[in-house]
Amino acid sequence: MHIADVTHYVKYRSPLDKEALSRGTSVYFPDRVLPMLPRALSNGICSLNEGEDRLTLSCLMRIDKKGVVKDSEIVEGVIRSTHRLTYTEVTKMLDGDEQTIAKYEDVQDMVCLFAELTKILKPVRAKKGTVSLDVKEAKILFENDEITIPDAKREFSHEIIEAFMVLANETVAEYAEALEAPFVYRIHEKPNEEKAATFRTFAQNLGLTARFQADDVKPYDYQNLLKSAEDLPVYAVLNRVMLRSMQKARYSPENVGHFGLASRCYCHFTSPIRRYPDLCIHRILKEIINGRYGEAVEKYTAFVEEAAQKSSDRERTAAEAEREVDALYMTMYMSERIGEEYEAVISGVTPYGLFAELPFAVEGFIPIETLEGNFEHIPERFLLKGTRESYSIGERIQVQVVEVDFYRRRTQFALLAKIKE
């Protein structure tokens, strides 16, 4: 896994580095990106362009046919990309598209090997208990003064990159932990007891078997629950409610593992252009592999505390900003669809009404006063129990877009009918 060596150009405590730490991460909006580092780096000398020599920090892994990393090495290097393939092109190659295969004939065997390895790694991760959430989020684009929400189809080519990045992140984190080096880990603590118990009750009310211990839930408990519901209508909502029951992943100088990935040890190594923790650990790794372990300990032991805390804070702030801007663009998108009717799924139940999600992942609100009858909210069952009709999370309904509120960034629906299963 070859990653651009950004630290060669962004020196520790330099003005560029201080600004990167202050930003913490790149921020992505539908119409623009606020980069962590200048575009001259991200789009220029640190971009692994086709046919150009680039400096890298690489994690070299030798993996056997069972998906086990037999040995690994972290090295500095220079690479020259033969081709810059897109996900679509890789998908076409694997699907046997003759024109694409002919165009990239020199890397066809390599791409096929990557696909073969990914198919080995997937069941290995599943056996560990990785919680593979399938939460659909609207991908909003703003181009040529037009808002679009394309169908974000997940291809196998995406899984290849994801599998290799996760493996590299684990391998690098395990290397640093074994050396007891100062480091920034990516941690994800297990769900707290109260939220796990609430989620367990929700799953049981859906008719699912959920017998895990709320005070000591394991990744495979959640994974098995998802697997048991993958062919049911409530699968999408189960994913979303499961996500809400989990803690937020964050950065820490202390390793406590990663619950969602069922990883004993994890970090972010693969994106130093857009995440400060990656940049920080690249520096530490370079000190160590060049025989300067003592200098790394002296220089970075205190700094990793600051880097982890600031990066976690900035990540949360960036995510909030992205959500707010996305919500505004969704509201603008739905403002042009007043009066249109859609099939939706109830995604939230409150004392004040229902939230419903459309097939393209846009959510709207149905106020309780627009529903017929009187209602009692039963939160532990995610249920709005009425004198005429009751509504619970996961049920399918027919809705109409009534109005939008730009100030609150909210779309209001009218409930037309409950769809009987």
Q: Where does each model-flagged region fall?
A:
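Short alpha-helix capping/helix-loop boundary micro-motifs
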Residues: 382-387
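Electropositive polyanion-binding surfaces
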Residues: 1-381, 394-421
